[in-house]
Swiss-Prot record:
Pfam families: DMRL_synthase. It comes from Desulforamulus reducens (strain ATCC BAA-1160 / DSM 100696 / MI-1). It is an enzyme of class 2 (transferase). It catalyses: (2S)-2-hydroxy-3-oxobutyl phosphate + 5-amino-6-(D-ribitylamino)uracil = 6,7-dimethyl-8-(1-D-ribityl)lumazine + phosphate + 2 H2O + H(+). This is 6,7-dimethyl-8-ribityllumazine synthase. Belongs to the DMRL synthase family.
Length: 154
């Protein structure tokens, strides 16, 4: 029988950094609320959560890297919202942020979770920030807890 490794959703004793983009703040505040709720419900103490605000999604990877490099956290949760406009700016920002977050995670061997919405419309962002399509901040926090615990077992 093969050995199976799985993470679990018990957050006691875990510490997380959260990076939040302020651009589209009416959405990112909801993502942050969802993430904080998930962390609390899974046993992460308030004093084990640190939040850094950045101007927008493009700035998220730099602060996430600084947090990951500090070795103070079991995971870093990145939250932001990039909404398509009439120019190619959306593609550039979305691509660079997603690549940056993935690279930090791989380079640091730390769960750096991508909770950045990349959507076509404001309505889609609202749906993913706590209405019809759930709250992606909540989902990102759950992924961070699960991955932090999984990496401790491998």
């Amino acid at each position: 029988m093969p050995k199976v490794f799985e993470g679990h959703l018990l957050g006691q004793e875990l510490k997380f950094g959260i990076v939040v983009g302020r651009f589209n703040e009416f959405i990112t505040n909801k993502l942050l609320s969802g993430a904080l709720d998930a962390l609390k419900r899974h046993g992460v103490e308030d004093e084990n959560v640190e939040i850094a605000y950045v101007p927008g999604a493009y700035e998220i990877p730099l602060v996430a890297k600084k947090m990951a490099d500090s070795k103070r956290y079991d995971g870093v949760i990145c939250l932001g919202a990039v909404i398509r406009g009439a120019t190619p700016h959306f593609e550039y920002v979305s691509a660079e942020v997603s690549k940056g977050v993935a690279k930090i995670s791989l380079d640091s061997n730390l769960p750096v979770i991508f909770g950045v919405l990349t959507v076509d419309t404001i309505e889609q962002a609202i749906e993913r920030a706590g209405t019809k399509a759930g709250n992606k901040g909540w989902e990102a926090a759950n992924a961070a807890i699960e991955m932090a615990n999984l990496l401790k077992t491998i």
